[in-house]
A protein has these predicted regions:
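Hydrophobic faces of well-ordered beta-strands that scaffold small-molecule active sites
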Residues: 42-44, 48-50, 95, 127-129, ...
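Short beta->alpha linker loops
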Residues: 56, 133-134, 287-290
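Long amphipathic N-terminal alpha/beta scaffold segment
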Residues: 27-66, 74
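Auxiliary Fe-S-binding modules of radical SAM enzymes
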Residues: 1-30, 35-40, 204, 211-313
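Short, flexible active-site loops
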Residues: 185-195, 223-232
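Conserved Radical SAM active-site core
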Residues: 8, 38-39, 54, 63-186, ...
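Short loop/turn motifs enriched for small/polar and acidic residues
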Residues: 100, 132, 192, 223, ...
Length: 313
């Protein structure tokens, strides 16, 4: 399929948004073509998440309130190894370790080190994990078995205090990235757009922090107003705000830029995929039908990656 640069400009120009946003999108899209050509990668089957803490979490974050833990496999109480074995039998290439946070913002992955090492050695699965905040010792322990560290990077102290409820600050997230990087663990930092009540608050600062540590991939997550949480009545971020973060990231990094599977559904998701593609995203997890349609209209070459997380190159 032949990529048509004029088609991209025409599609961006037809969007119902302001001229400055359109200009930033076109610039970012051209940059993305320079870096990755006409290929766009679609990850239709992300790794299955396994919660190492079951549904337990010491935090009651306003955007989550343990909701997402209830939709993961329960790997607590010695069940991690058996779950990994079943996933391997089903053809899984890797596993995503997650779970509730301790009061300090860390996820106790290291408490399951022996099982994780066995899984990696015996089943040859790729191991990625949501690490949370870590210190040097924890990062060193993680380096024994992690193939990729997935870390939400928050760039605003008030968001950390008021939304996550953690007695920490932006510096702690930067120090965690430094510890993980120094331990030699490949990084796939996650930037959550709209985490602060659906508004931008620290996302661009988070990108500046991430740039210091040479990540493998940068992943863009979009806040989901979730039923049963304090933020269920909040609107998701404006598409223009998501575009602002994506285009900023595309200008800062020459590495893959992924749109996470964690993003709102429905018509918003469909429109988001369109805006994201036109803003320089080169990979999407669980793409919508609209993502396929827009990519074909642009003449992009769709490369489907099966049974793999979008945080991997």
């Amino acid at each position: 399929m032949h990529f048509d640069p004029h088609r991209a400009a025409s599609m961006i120009d037809s969007l119902e948004t302001d001229a400055a946003t359109k200009a930033s999108m076109l610039k970012a899209f051209k940059r993305r073509i320079e870096l990755f050509g006409g290929n766009i990668h679609f990850f239709r089957e992300p790794f299955t998440p396994v919660s190492l803490t079951g549904t337990q979490c010491s935090l009651y974050c306003k955007h989550c309130n343990s909701h997402y833990l209830r939709h993961m496999l329960d790997g607590s109480g010695g069940k991690l190894y058996s779950h990994a074995g079943l996933l391997k039998e089903k053809g899984a290439e890797g596993i995503l370790l997650s779970g509730g946070s301790a009061a300090d913002g860390s996820v106790p992955t290291y408490a399951h080190a022996m099982d994780i090492l066995k899984i990696r050695q015996e089943m040859k699965l790729k191991i990625s994990a949501h690490t949370g905040i870590v210190d040097d010792l924890q990062a060193h322990m993680l380096s024994e078995y992690l193939d990729m560290a997935l870390m939400d990077v928050i760039g605003d102290d008030e968001t950390i205090h008021d939304i996550l409820g953690i007695d920490a600050c932006v510096r702690d997230y930067e120090d965690s990235l430094r510890a993980l990087s120094s331990a030699g663990i490949p990084l796939a930092p996650h930037i959550i757009v709209g985490l602060h009540n659906g508004k931008l608050r620290g996302e661009l600062k988070a990108l500046e922090i991430v740039r210091k540590f040479n990540p493998e991939v940068v992943v863009i997550v979009v806040f989901i107003p979730t039923k049963g949480t304090a933020l269920e009545g909040i609107a998701p971020p404006r598409l223009e705000d998501v575009v602002k973060v994506i285009t900023k990231a595309r200008g800062m990094f020459d590495i893959p830029l992924s749109l996470s599977c964690v993003r709102p559904g429905g018509r918003y998701r469909s429109m988001l995929d369109k805006y994201a593609i036109l803003s320089g995203i080169d990979r999407i997890a669980v793409p919508t039908r609209n993502a396929y349609e827009i990519s074909r209209q642009l003449g992009l070459n769709i490369v489907e990656i099966r049974k793999m997380c979008c945080s991997y190159k």
